[in-house]
A protein has these predicted regions:
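Alpha/beta-hydrolase active-site loop
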Residues: 33-55
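Glycine-rich nucleophile elbow surrounding the catalytic serine of serine-hydrolase chemistry
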Residues: 66-78
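Conserved hydrolase catalytic core segment
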Residues: 79-86
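Active-site nucleophile loop of the alpha/beta-hydrolase fold
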Residues: 87-97
Length: 178
């Protein structure tokens, strides 16, 4: 049995899905600006707005989704763009997860992710609704940072997920369908 229903069976007709993923030009950026490209954030926001325009989608009907590093981008872009967000165990800057062996790409991000998310609550509209983050205090190495963001932005809904197949952060993405 799978903890999540398959999204294709659960969405309404005329629904368009853009999943935040950390690939291509943005590899390793978590959807954030890097030292090599300071336009990633603006490009993503413009891409979302462009698709909304092409498909005549109202802002209140947009949900930004992602897991892990894609969840980082989903939370960030959902908050700065004022979109609904559904993020699963996003990385918000806890380098302890890497045990002192930070991947090189984390050093290419223009501003450290932890700093970005500490400043973010002072830079956005706090009246946002439908900001949902799924994590687990039992298994997620990222949970303390997620809890800090929730403290700074109380409108974020933090869903504490408990499923026997999820024993560590890496298990979230493998047990997620969206």
């Amino acid at each position: 049995s799978h903890p999540f229903p398959f999204i294709s069976n659960s969405i309404m007709p005329n629904t368009y899905i853009i999943r935040m993923a950390d690939v291509s030009d943005a590899f390793g950026s978590h959807g954030l600006n890097t030292k090599f490209d300071e336009n990633i954030e603006a490009n993503i926001q413009n891409f979302i707005k462009s698709l909304m325009n092409i498909y005549s989608v109202d802002k209140e009907n947009v949900v930004i989704c992602g897991a892990s590093s894609g969840g980082t981008g989903a939370v960030y872009h959902g908050l700065i763009g004022g979109y609904k967000t559904f993020a699963i165990d996003p990385f918000l800057g806890n380098h302890n997860y890497y045990g002192g062996k930070d991947p090189l790409y984390l050093h290419s991000i223009r501003t450290p992710i932890g700093e970005i998310f500490k400043k973010l609550p002072n830079e956005i509209d706090h009246n946002l609704e439908n900001q949902v983050v799924i994590s687990s205090a039992k298994v997620s190495e990222f949970y303390p940072d997620i809890k800090e963001l929730k403290k700074a932005l109380p409108t974020i809904t933090l869903c504490e997920f408990d499923f026997e197949k999820i024993q560590k952060h890496i298990d979230f993405s493998g047990n997620t369908v969206f």
